[in-house]
Swiss-Prot record:
CDD domains: INT_XerDC_C. Site-specific tyrosine recombinase, which acts by catalyzing the cutting and rejoining of the recombining DNA molecules. The XerC-XerD complex is essential to convert dimers of the bacterial chromosome into monomers to permit their segregation at cell division. It also contributes to the segregational stability of plasmids. Residues 111-290 form the Tyr recombinase domain. It comes from the Bacteria. It is found in: Cytoplasm. This is Tyrosine recombinase XerC. PANTHER family: PHAGE INTEGRASE-RELATED, TYROSINE RECOMBINASE XERC.
Length: 302
């Protein structure tokens, strides 16, 4: 047990008996708790022991383990051992307050979904066909990637949402916050092709994307169509709306150093947890978009 004092060693032995007899924990759990206590004791400052450790010391220990790459599960186990130790010392009258009470382990950030590279997206968007379903689906996928829309945002678009002459789409995002997002030339062309078919579908709904019977497309239907085209184009990844949105963000950030512009294009309050949300004028957003997005450039005459 390293450089522990005799009192610490005695307390740990009593703690082990307490876990077995009174808490009736399994031998495996008891072993894990003792292992964790021995580990964290080596991370405490030299003048701090398991008997006089404070809340700030436990916070520092957890932060160190987090930085070392300990998994959330391992951090949770360590925290449980620390809390049980505090409860034991409290029960024995050796401390007045459990310093670990209320502590929570640092959470590791969830990995972002893998984006599709430009070549894969280009291949996906090269679908051909003149039937209404193909034209509609191509327009949806182009718009997802062109403007980084959320699934709910695209599904809620109406015929009046797109300003074709200005190459803009008016989007109602989370919290009913409206924003204007540029639309690339490829997406505009695909939308115009779909619009010809859309106008021939009897429909009382003003939705931009509808079924053959004139009903607004559901979220599930849009997801299903994206997955279908990913399979038909023989892509190695499953295609879904958020993957296109994430690819939009990734490719924009790779081409542009303007994090705040991309943040606003996405409609995020925070793209980075440390980045304070700032509002940019639309002219600047359009300029960044036009110079950075792979499919925003005007098509050259062939």
């Amino acid at each position: 047990m390293g450089d522990m004092s005799d009192l610490e060693v005695t307390c740990l032995q009593d703690y082990e008996r307490y876990l077995h007899s009174e808490r009736q924990l399994s031998a495996h759990t008891v072993h894990n708790y003792l292992y964790e206590l021995n580990r964290v004791s080596t991370l405490l400052p030299k003048d701090v022991t398991l008997l006089n450790v404070g809340r700030e010391h436990w916070q520092q220990v957890l932060a160190k383990l987090h930085r070392k790459g300990l998994s959330p599960r391992s951090l949770s186990l360590c925290l449980s051992a620390i809390k049980q130790w505090g409860e034991f010392l409290l029960r024995e009258g050796m401390i007045a307050v459990n310093p670990a009470k209320g502590l929570s382990a640092p959470k590791q950030a969830k990995p972002l979904p893998k984006n599709m590279d430009v070549d894969s997206l280009t291949h996906l968007l090269e679908i051909e066909g003149t039937d209404p379903l193909t034209l509609r689906d191509k327009a949806m996928m182009e718009l997802f990637y062109s403007s980084g829309l959320r699934l709910a945002e695209l599904a809620a678009l109406n015929l009046s949402s797109v300003q074709y002459d200005l190459r803009e789409v008016r989007v109602l995002g989370k919290g009913n916050k409206e924003r204007i997002v540029p639309v690339g030339s490829y997406a505009i062309k695909a939308l115009e092709a779909w619009l010809v078919c859309r106008q021939q579908i009897p429909c009382e709904d003003c939705a931009l994307f509808v079924t053959g019977k004139g009903r607004r497309l559901s979220h599930r239907s849009i997801q299903s169509r994206m997955a279908k085209w990913g399979q038909e184009q023989a892509l190695s990844v499953r295609v879904h709306p958020h993957k296109l949105r994430h690819s939009f963000a990734t490719h924009m950030l790779e081409s542009s150093a303007d994090l705040r512009a991309v943040q606003e294009l996405l409609g995020h309050a925070n793209l980075s947890t440390t980045q304070i949300y700032t509002s940019l004028d639309f002219q600047h957003l359009a300029k960044v978009y036009d110079s950075a997005h792979p499919r925003a450039k005007k098509q050259q005459d062939k």
